[in-house]
Structures are given as structure tokens and as C-alpha cells.
């Protein structure tokens, strides 16, 4: 289920082996990825509150945070009494009108679908713009393999359509999103 919770990895998450001797360090660091986090947060219209001391100070979300509501405030007060740090989590749900879509009306039906279009998803944020720019959306397809040239560079993808027929789609750039 897509809850629209919008986490960022922290700088230390990229170097767990160096810091803690477990796992593997990433081949890139937070600073390299940060501009892309910000870009996608703008594309989706993320609501959040800047200033969380667990994250770098430069984070600034395109929309203010969603209201916590009575239950959220109850949890926040309980955590504060225990001395725990709490912060409203960023969400890809619009707290105000954004990019032609409406704000959340706090109906609480997020999992059944958002009639206002306030809960961001690629069918609202990216597909319409890509199709308007000439992209073709193929549904019911499954990529079998990313194809490479003799030097190992991606040249396209072999995929199956809904009827099981194989196709090859050449591409200048290939991306393995891995359900991202």
C-alpha cells in the first residue's frame, strides 16, 4: 500500500560499514543525492516541516506540513513527556493546492483513493506530463531484461506485453528503478 510517507535517508545511512562495521557503504553519499531528493519532492508536492535536527538543515519542502489532528498531537505530547524527539513526517500529500491539484480535505480515505488528487502518485505527477510530451504508456507489460552493448552500457529493454509477446524497446538511457 502507498501511504505517501516520504522518508529521506540520513547522511549516516550511506556509510553504515564505516560508522558501525555492518552492511556496506553506498558508492555515493547524501550530498550527491540531496539535489535529486529535492527535485522529486517538488515534482510530487511533498508536505513537510523543515528544521528536523535529524536531517541536514537545507531541507525545505514545497508545502507546509499536514495538520497532525487530535491523535497526532496526543502521540507528540506523550513522546515529549518521555523526552523523545518527535517531528511530523513528510508526506506526498498536498497540504495546499499545488501544481494544478487540490489540497487534502482530511477525509481519511487515503487507502481507498483520493478523490481530490491530493495524494501524489506517478499517474498524477508524471504520466500526464510525459504523455503530453510524446511518451507512450504501456500497461500490463513486464520487463524481462535490460539489454547492454559490448561495453556493458544499457541500450534498451526486452519486455513482454499483456499477451506474453516479446518486444525490444531501444533507449538512450535505461534505469532500473527496482519498484522505486
PLM segments and residue spans:
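Flavin (primarily FAD) binding-site architecture
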Residues: 176-180
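Conserved beta-strand-loop-beta-strand element in the redox core of flavoprotein oxidoreductases
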Residues: 145-169, 174
Amino acid at each position: 500500500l502507498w501511504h505517501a510517507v516520504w522518508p529521506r535517508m540520513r547522511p549516516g545511512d550511506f556509510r553504515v560499514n564505516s560508522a558501525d562495521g555492518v552492511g556496506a557503504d553506498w558508492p555515493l553519499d547524501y550530498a550527491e543525492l540531496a539535489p535529486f531528493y529535492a527535485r522529486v519532492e517538488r515534482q510530487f508536492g511533498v508536505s513537510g516541516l523543515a528544521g528536523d535536527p535529524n536531517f541536514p538543515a537545507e531541507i525545505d519542502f514545497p508545502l507546509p506540513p499536514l495538520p497532525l489532528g487530535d491523535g497526532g498531537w496526543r502521540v507528540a505530547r506523550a513522546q515529549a513527556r518521555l523526552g523523545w524527539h518527535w517531528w511530523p513526517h513528510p508526506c506526498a500529500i498536498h497540504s495546499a493546492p499545488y501544481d494544478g491539484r487540490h489540497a487534502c480535505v482530511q477525509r481519511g480515505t487515503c487507502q481507498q483513493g483520493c478523490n481530490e488528487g491530493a495524494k501524489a502518485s506517478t499517474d498524477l505527477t508524471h504520466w500526464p506530463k510525459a504523455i503530453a510530451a510524446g511518451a507512450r504508456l504501456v500497461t500490463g507489460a513486464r520487463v524481462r531484461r535490460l539489454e547492454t552493448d559490448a561495453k556493458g552500457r544499457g541500450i534498451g529493454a526486452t519486455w513482454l506485453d499483456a499477451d506474453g509477446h516479446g518486444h525490444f524497446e531501444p533507449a538512450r538511457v535505461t534505469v532500473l528503478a527496482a519498484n522505486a
